[in-house]
């Protein structure tokens, strides 16, 4: 994949604190408090999903910042109060608070803010306007949809015009699984398919994905959420090798 050397590849897993990774990734005897530092030796980014359930404290973000290398980047998933409960209605204050804590805590290591919408959140003009009017274009905002109605030309055009990233995904459903490349950064989530969170992708599938990234792309964030067992670790390392990423 030497043709993609100019791309800033950010490859990692959706989280790091998995007890089943003990002995298969984390060395025996390594204290759990040192797991994140060990993770950072192997990957240059992480997608934090625990923030979906409870927003981490500023102290947690500061700790992650201090424990990670200078060029490490974080993606933080927005709380479900914004995306699943309120569905962006009456959420301006919540979004501002979310932005504030991740910017303050992660500073120059903040990669993306991820907003994952539920399958019940289908496309309407009103909902598209809610997204466009509530997101701060000064940040790298990534939206992951789970309803196929969002794959339409109007959405793609508005996202491009407003510097929003439409997340590609591999998910056990009928949703399209191609990469969506009209704004930098490109963002893709491997959730496990056909078995959610579990299935290992073949090396050929990883090669096909890497080759799909168009020349001229500046930055790509790729996260493996098939974190059951070794699947995410194996696939992430395969992609790192394919992209000649030196860690």
Please give the residue ranges for each predicted region:
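Residues lining hydrophobic/aromatic ligand-binding pockets adjacent to catalytic sites
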Residues: 1-247
């Amino acid at each position: 994949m030497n043709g993609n050397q100019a791309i800033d590849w950010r490859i990692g897993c959706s989280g790091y604190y998995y007890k089943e990774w003990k002995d298969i990734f984390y060395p025996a005897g390594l204290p759990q408090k040192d797991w994140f530092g060990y993770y950072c030796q192997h990957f240059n980014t992480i997608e934090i999903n625990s923030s979906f359930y409870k927003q981490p404290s500023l102290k947690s973000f500061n700790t992650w910042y201090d424990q990670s290398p200078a060029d490490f980047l974080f993606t933080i998933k927005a709380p479900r109060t914004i995306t699943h409960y309120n569905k962006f209605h009456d959420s301006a204050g919540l979004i501002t608070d979310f932005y504030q804590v991740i910017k303050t805590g992660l500073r120059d290591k903040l990669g993306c803010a991820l907003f994952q919408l539920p399958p019940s959140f289908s496309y309407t003009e009103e909902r598209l306007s809610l997204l466009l009017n509530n997101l701060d274009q000064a940040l790298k905002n990534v939206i992951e949809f789970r309803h196929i109605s969002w794959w339409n030309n109007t959405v793609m055009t508005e996202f491009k015009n407003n510097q929003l990233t439409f997340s590609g995904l591999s998910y056990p459903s009928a949703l399209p699984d191609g990469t969506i490349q009209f704004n930098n950064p490109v963002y893709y989530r491997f959730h496990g398919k056909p078995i959610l969170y579990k299935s290992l992708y073949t090396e050929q599938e990883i090669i096909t994905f890497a080759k799909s990234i168009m020349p001229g792309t500046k930055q790509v964030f790729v996260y493996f959420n098939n974190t059951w067992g070794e699947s995410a670790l194996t696939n992430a390392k395969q992609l790192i090798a394919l992209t000649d990423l030196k860690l």
